[in-house]
Amino acid sequence: MKVKPLRYSRDQAEFDRAIGFIDATFALALTLLVTTLDIDDPGAAFSSLGALNDAVGQQAIAFGIAFAVIANYWLQHHRLIASFTAIDYTTIAVNLFLVAAIVLLPFSTQSVGDPGVEDLPLPTVIMAVNVVLASTLHTLVYVVAVRRNLLSPAPGRGEISYTVVNGLASAAVFGASVPIAYLISPVAAQITWISLIPISQFLGRYGARRRRTIDAA
């Protein structure tokens, strides 16, 4: 006899427990980012703004980038979960892989923000790969939810295509920065991350028109 997969509707406690755990993990990852700000000599660092910038300037930039990345993932995840009518074990499992990638971000951020290794490509590559994994897994959560009919209203083909392409844009940009870190420099690779801003704006405008065209067909 075929066993029916476990599925919990929004009004069940198991749904709240699953989402509550995921939200708490996002919050923990954001909180742990503060541990990436490390001052070796507080007396010298707080002697002037210039000294403070020398001590934690690069770490603060890495902190800001990682905070924005994690917060953006949580906002996207929050919007996605708002459309869930139920959740099942498969979707919970994919979400656990997602939060595994999220909780690694404080570590990868610390490696990028460490002044002692700023000229080495590996720290930048580690963070880039971390974001690629997080972006891919977040998109996978959406795809799994669509395939298992967990969303209401059910998205059309245009909306599905737009969401998947938009979700994988971060993975593409950060993935492209990996060879740049080795072939040019870590700084050049990190600068390419900024290109995600105009790319996201373009996808937002073009994708909306494309989505309406496909759904109307």
Enumerate the language-model features and the residues they cover.
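Multi-pass alpha-helical transmembrane bundle typical of ion/small-solute transporters
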Residues: 1-217
